[in-house]
Regions:
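Membrane-interface segments of envelope glycosyltransferases acting on lipid-linked substrates or membrane lipids
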Residues: 1-182
Length: 182
């Protein structure tokens, strides 16, 4: 598939800590940049910020993962950023950032509204709070197990909205040779 114009993709997550969500965010940012697309990441700074910046991604150090009453203000900021930067896709990778993203997008006219993607990284508690992760135009499940979790616990989610994209290990950055002694 050839795109007529480069995409602008915004990823939302709590913080650039060291973990699978965060590492995946940096990898997606890198892949987007290498393919000529524009990557924007919105989250609180953390140990992977330098890695993210090396991808050429734009970084907004906003604490959108803090469970605090004032965090709601970031929904307006995300909305304004989507409009000013002409974001094509918003990809939420965690529940609180997803709530902020969903609220932000609900205030954008349909013709200017980015595509809404969520990734379910684990079997969250089944609750109204977690249900936001099922609100994506497309929902990425990181394994068949997670896909089954979604279909079992959220029967209203249409199967054609769920895409399974298994996580993997980059052998170039991880030593896969080990022994029992290690």
């Amino acid at each position: 598939m050839t795109l007529e114009k480069p995409l602008t993709v915004m990823q939302l997550l709590p913080k650039l800590s060291i973990g699978g969500v965060e590492r995946g965010t940096v990898q997606i940012a890198d892949a987007l940049s290498k393919r000529g697309h524009r990557s924007i990441v919105v989250c609180e700074s953390g140990p992977l910020e330098r890695d993210l910046r090396e991808t050429g991604s734009e970084f907004f150090n906003w604490p959108i993962g803090r469970k605090h009453a004032l965090t709601i203000q970031y929904a307006r900021k995300i909305r304004n950023l989507c409009l000013s930067e002409k974001v094509d896709i918003v990809h939420a990778r965690s529940r609180l950032p997803a709530w902020l993203g969903r609220l932000a997008l609900s205030k954008i006219k349909k013709e200017k509204c980015p595509v809404w993607i969520t990734t379910v990284h684990g079997p969250y508690s089944v609750s109204a709070y977690s249900k936001v992760m099922m609100s994506g135009d497309k929902i990425i499940a990181i394994s068949n197990y997670i896909r089954d979790y979604i279909t079992k616990n959220y029967p209203g989610v249409e199967n054609d909205r769920i895409i399974t994209i298994p996580r993997g290990v980059d052998e170039a950055t991880h030593n896969l040779e080990f022994s029992v002694e290690q």
